[in-house]
């Protein structure tokens, strides 16, 4: 399991909604990633729409997948 030091925190925008609470996110650096909601966002019933600005955490070992940890207002 990745340690907290191994995560990369970036910001991006939701570009596409995928089945199973997955999303296509376009990061600020132009890189597209596939992301899912973190557990606390699922439990709080926080929904994302296309165009929402989000903060994602990525593992340093797989830069194609991410976890959405915050939706900006």
UniProtKB/Swiss-Prot annotation:
A Pfam family it matches: eIF-1a
Presence of the UniProt keyword rRNA-binding in the record: yes
Keyword hit for rRNA-binding: yes
Coiled-coil region list: none
SUPFAM superfamilies hit by this protein: Nucleic acid-binding proteins
Start and end residues of each S1-like domain: 1-73
GO molecular function: ribosome binding; rRNA binding; translation initiation factor activity
Subcellular location: Cytoplasm
PROSITE patterns: S1_IF1_TYPE
Classification via Gene3D superfamilies: Nucleic acid-binding proteins
Taxonomic superkingdom: Bacteria
Keywords: Cytoplasm, Initiation factor, Protein biosynthesis, RNA-binding, rRNA-binding
InterPro entries, alphabetized: NA-bd_OB-fold, RNA-binding_domain_S1_IF1, S1_domain, TIF_IF1
A GO CC term attached to the entry: cytosol
Subunit structure: Component of the 30S ribosomal translation pre-initiation complex which assembles on the 30S ribosome in the order IF-2 and IF-3, IF-1 and N-formylmethionyl-tRNA(fMet); mRNA recruitment can occur at any time during PIC assembly.
HAMAP family linked: IF_1 (MF_00075)
Family that this chain belongs to: Belongs to the IF-1 family.
Function: One of the essential components for the initiation of protein synthesis. Stabilizes the binding of IF-2 and IF-3 on the 30S subunit to which N-formylmethionyl-tRNA(fMet) subsequently binds. Helps modulate mRNA selection, yielding the 30S pre-initiation complex (PIC). Upon addition of the 50S ribosomal subunit IF-1, IF-2 and IF-3 are released leaving the mature 70S translation initiation complex.
Name under which the protein is recorded: Translation initiation factor IF-1
Organism (species): Chlamydia abortus (strain DSM 27085 / S26/3)
Lineage: Bacteria, Pseudomonadati, Chlamydiota, Chlamydiia, Chlamydiales
Gene this protein is translated from: infA
């Amino acid at each position: 399991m990745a340690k907290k030091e191994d995560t990369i925190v970036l910001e991006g925008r939701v570009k596409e909604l995928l089945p199973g609470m997955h999303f296509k996110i376009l990061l600020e650096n132009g890189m597209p990633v596939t992301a899912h909601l973190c557990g606390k966002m699922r439990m709080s019933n926080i929904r994302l729409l296309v165009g929402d600005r989000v903060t994602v955490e990525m593992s340093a070992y797989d830069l194609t997948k991410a976890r959405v940890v915050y939706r900006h207002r």
